[in-house]
């Protein structure tokens, strides 16, 4: 779904990974938890700033992991939350929206995804 057209002239800056609600979401990178919160489009979100300042964005979560704290360091593979359909995904099946942003903008995150 990377690059697909969205409403209001937007493009899809990520990939959607469909999974049952509550499926654990693991970080694809080591780094600092830079954001835990909520926004209109992404719903419940977690942001991690990885090496080189690359920002990893995890959205539509049911909830973040209980022990996750902003400004804390995590390793790749750490539990960061659980699949849901929050934000503008309320009418869709549960899924994780995963986006990656460099200083130049959004990049296709698909190559960074791997099975644990």
Predicted features and spans:
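Conserved, short, structured surface segments that act as functional micro-motifs
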Residues: 45-49, 72-116
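A generic structural signal for solvent-exposed, polar alpha-helical segments
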Residues: 8, 63-66, 103-104
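Zn2+-dependent peptidoglycan hydrolase active-site motif and core
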Residues: 27-69, 92-97
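Surface-exposed, glycine-biased beta-strand/turn segments
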Residues: 1-44, 75-76, 85, 107-110
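Non-catalytic surface loops within mature trypsin-like serine protease
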Residues: 19-21, 62-63, 102, 115
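Short acidic/polar mixed-charge low-complexity motifs
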Residues: 23, 52-55, 105-106
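Short alpha-helical segments in extracytoplasmic peptidoglycan/chitin-binding modules
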Residues: 6, 58, 80
């Amino acid at each position: 779904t990377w690059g697909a057209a969205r409403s209001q002239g937007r493009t899809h800056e990520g990939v959607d990974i469909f999974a049952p609600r509550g499926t654990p979401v693991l970080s694809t990178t080591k780094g600092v938890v830079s954001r835990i919160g909520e926004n209109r489009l992404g719903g419940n979100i977690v942001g991690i700033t990885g090496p080189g300042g690359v920002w990893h964005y995890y959205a539509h979560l049911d909830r973040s992991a209980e022990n996750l704290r902003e400004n804390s360091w995590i390793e790749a593979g750490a539990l960061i939350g659980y699949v849901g359909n929050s934000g503008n995904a309320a009418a869709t099946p549960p899924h994780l929206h995963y986006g990656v942003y460099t200083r130049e903008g959004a990049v296709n995150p698909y190559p960074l995804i791997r099975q644990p």
